[in-house]
C-alpha cells in the first residue's frame, strides 16, 4: 500500500522533520514519491517515479527548507498503473480559481462506472481517475467551501469508497481535506502539535529532537499520516471520517467535535445569556492566541453544532442563523455532556468578554 502525509499549520513551516521520518518508509514503497505545497498561494509539485530515499530531489526538498502552511506528500507502492511521472502522486488540477492537489492510498476496482465530466486523467491510475470524478462532481453540484458543502463532499467520497479501499488527502492551499476508508481497510492518523514543545522521538530512526529548538511558540497545527511518525499522542481517524483543516485548526469532522466547536461551546457555556455570532467571533479572536478565525470558519462551526444538536438559535431572533446578529445558546439537555467534554479544555486566555 502507499503512505500519505498531510500538514496544515497556522504559519508557514519547514517540512524537513516530517519528511525525514517519511522517507525511511520508502524502502517498502519504491514506486514513486511526491510532495505538493503552496509557498505563495500557488501550488508547487515535486515528484519522481523512483524510491524516495534514493532521490536527489527529495534531499533538495529537505535541505532547501521550503516553507508552506500546507503540504501533501505521498510514497507509492504501485497497485494500478506503471512506474511513470504521470502516475506518481500528488496529482494537480485547476478548479475555477483553486489549484487542487490530491493523493490517494488504496486500490479501487470498477471505478470506471463513475462518469467524468470536464476533468480527465492523463495517466493510468485509479487514483487520478477518481480525483477527476471528485472535481467533476464539485463543479457540477456547485459545492462551496462551507459546512453544507463539506457534507456534500463527504457523500462524493463515500460514493468513490464503494469501489474499494480509499484514503485520500487533498487541498486548495487554504483548506486541507483528509478522508479515511469507511471500512477501515487502510490506517490514517492525526496529531495536533502545539506549544509548549518538548522532546520527541522519530519512530523510524533512533533519533530524539527537542521541538522547542526548531519550533516557534506561535506555531501550531495538525499532521496527518498513514502511520504515526513520532512517539507523540497520535489519534486514529474514525472509519468514514472526513476532517477539514484551515490555518492549523480542525474546522470540520462528521465523526467528532472539533476544537473550533469546543471553543464555541465554551464561550456559550460561560455566558449567562445568549451570545451573538458577532460576539462569538470577537471572543474567538481574543481567546485564541495563535489561530485566526474568520467569519466563514466560525459559521462552519456554528452550523455543525446546530446540526449535531448541541446548540439552538434563540427563537426571538428575526435574522437567519448565519447573520452576525443571530444569537445562540446551548441546549439544556446537552449541558451535562458539554461540560464533560469541556473538562480540561483550556486556552491561554481564560476570561470571556461579553460587553
UniProtKB/Swiss-Prot annotation:
Which part of the chain is the Glutamine amidotransferase type-2 domain? Answer: 2-248
- List UniProt keywords, sorted A-Z: Glutamine amidotransferase
**Which CDD domains does the entry mention?**
YafJ (cd01908)
Q: Which domain of life is it from?
A: Archaea
- A Pfam family of this chain: GATase_4
Q: Which InterPro entries match?
A: EgtC-like, GATase_2_dom, Ntn_hydrolases_N, WH-like_DNA-bd_sf
Q: Which residues form the active site?
A: 2 (for gatase activity)
SUPFAM superfamilies reported in the protein's UniProt record: N-terminal nucleophile aminohydrolases (Ntn hydrolases) (SSF56235)
Task: Identify this protein by name.
Answer: Uncharacterized protein MJ1515
- Annotated organism of origin: Methanocaldococcus jannaschii (strain ATCC 43067 / DSM 2661 / JAL-1 / JCM 10045 / NBRC 100440) (Methanococcus jannaschii)
Organism ancestry:
Archaea, Methanobacteriati, Methanobacteriota, Methanomada group, Methanococci
Amino acid at each position: 500500500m502507499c503512505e500519505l502525509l498531510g500538514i496544515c499549520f497556522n504559519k508557514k513551516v519547514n517540512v524537513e522533520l516530517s519528511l525525514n521520518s517519511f522517507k525511511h518508509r520508502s524502502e517498502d514503497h519504491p514506486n514513486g514519491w511526491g510532495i505538493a505545497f503552496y509557498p505563495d498561494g500557488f501550488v508547487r509539485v515535486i515528484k519522481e517515479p523512483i524510491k524516495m530515499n534514493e532521490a536527489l530531489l527529495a534531499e533538495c526538498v529537505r535541505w532547501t527548507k521550503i516553507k508552506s502552511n500546507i503540504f501533501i506528500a505521498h510514497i507509492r507502492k504501485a497497485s494500478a498503473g506503471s512506474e511513470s511521472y504521470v502516475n506518481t502522486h500528488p496529482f494537480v488540477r485547476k478548479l475555477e480559481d483553486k489549484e487542487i492537489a490530491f493523493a490517494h492510498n488504496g486500490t479501487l476496482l470498477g471505478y470506471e462506472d463513475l462518469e467524468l465530466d470536464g476533468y480527465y486523467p492523463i495517466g493510468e491510475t485509479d487514483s487520478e481517475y477518481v480525483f477527476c470524478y471528485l472535481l467533476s462532481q464539485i463543479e457540477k453540484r456547485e459545492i462551496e467551501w462551507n459546512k453544507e458543502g463539506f457534507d456534500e463532499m463527504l457523500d462524493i467520497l463515500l460514493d468513490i469508497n464503494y469501489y474499494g479501499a480509499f484514503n485520500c488527502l487533498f487541498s486548495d492551499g487554504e483548506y486541507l481535506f483528509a478522508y479515511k476508508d469507511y471500512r477501515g481497510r487502510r490506517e490514517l492518523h492525526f496529531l495536533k502539535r502545539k506549544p509548549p514543545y518538548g522532546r520527541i522521538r522519530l519512530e523510524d530512526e533512533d533519533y530524539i529532537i527537542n521541538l522547542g529548538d526548531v519550533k516557534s511558540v506561535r506555531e501550531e497545527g495538525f499532521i496527518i499520516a498513514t502511520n504515526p511518525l513520532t512517539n507523540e499522542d497520535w489519534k486514529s481517524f474514525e472509519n468514514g471520517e472526513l476532517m477539514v483543516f484551515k490555518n492549523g485548526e480542525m474546522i470540520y469532522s462528521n465523526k467528532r467535535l472539533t476544537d473550533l466547536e469546543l471553543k464555541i461551546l465554551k464561550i456559550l457555556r460561560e455566558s449567562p445569556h445568549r451570545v451573538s455570532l458577532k460576539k462569538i467571533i470577537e471572543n474567538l479572536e481574543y481567546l485564541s492566541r495563535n489561530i485566526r478565525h474568520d467569519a466563514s470558519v466560525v459559521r462552519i462551526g456554528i452550523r455543525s453544532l446546530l446540526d449535531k444538536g448541541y446548540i439552538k438559535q434563540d427563537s426571538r431572533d428575526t435574522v437567519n442563523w448565519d447573520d452576525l446578529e443571530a444569537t445562540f445558546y446551548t441546549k439544556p439537555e446537552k449541558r451535562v455532556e458539554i461540560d464533560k467534554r469541556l473538562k480540561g479544555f483550556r486556552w491561554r486566555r481564560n476570561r470571556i468578554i461579553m460587553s
